[in-house]
């Protein structure tokens, strides 16, 4: 799989759904407008980026970045 965010992944895609509060939805919409992506694509890219960069999100919301070799 390519390490490029936004590259077409190898393998089958799955659908998920989640709820966002209005403030986060607004931030997502603003980001999508700035990037030119659809709101759905913006969310996909941001989730992929976050999961690749961070190994854990503790309850205290102090993110622990993954070590990059």
UniProtKB/Swiss-Prot annotation:
**Main location (coarse class):** cytoplasm
**Which family, according to UniProt?**
Belongs to the TraY family.
Q: What is this protein called?
A: Relaxosome protein TraY
Which keywords describe this protein according to UniProt? Answer: Conjugation, Cytoplasm, DNA-binding, Plasmid
What InterPro entries does the database record attribute to this sequence?
A: TraY (IPR008876)
Superkingdom of this protein's organism = Bacteria
Q: Which Pfam families match?
A: TraY (PF05509)
Q: Which GO terms describe its molecular function?
A: DNA binding
What species was this sequence derived from? Salmonella typhi
Functionally, this protein is described as follows: Conjugative DNA transfer (CDT) is the unidirectional transfer of ssDNA plasmid from a donor to a recipient cell. It is the central mechanism by which antibiotic resistance and virulence factors are propagated in bacterial populations. Part of the relaxosome, which facilitates a site- and strand-specific cut in the origin of transfer by TraI, at the nic site. Relaxosome formation requires binding of IHF and TraY to the oriT region, which then facilitates binding of TraI.
GO CC annotations? cytoplasm
Subcellular localization is given as: Cytoplasm
**Complex and partners:** Part of the relaxosome, a complex composed of plasmid encoded TraI, TraM, TraY and host-encoded IHF bound to the F plasmid origin of transfer (oriT).
């Amino acid at each position: 799989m390519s390490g490029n965010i936004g590259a077409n992944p190898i393998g089958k895609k799955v659908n998920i759904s989640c709820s966002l509060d209005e403030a986060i939805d607004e931030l997502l919409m603003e980001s999508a407008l700035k990037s030119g992506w659809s709101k759905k694509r913006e969310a996909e890219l941001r989730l992929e980026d976050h999961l690749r960069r961070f190994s854990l999100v503790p309850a205290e919301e102090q993110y622990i970045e993954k070590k990059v070799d």
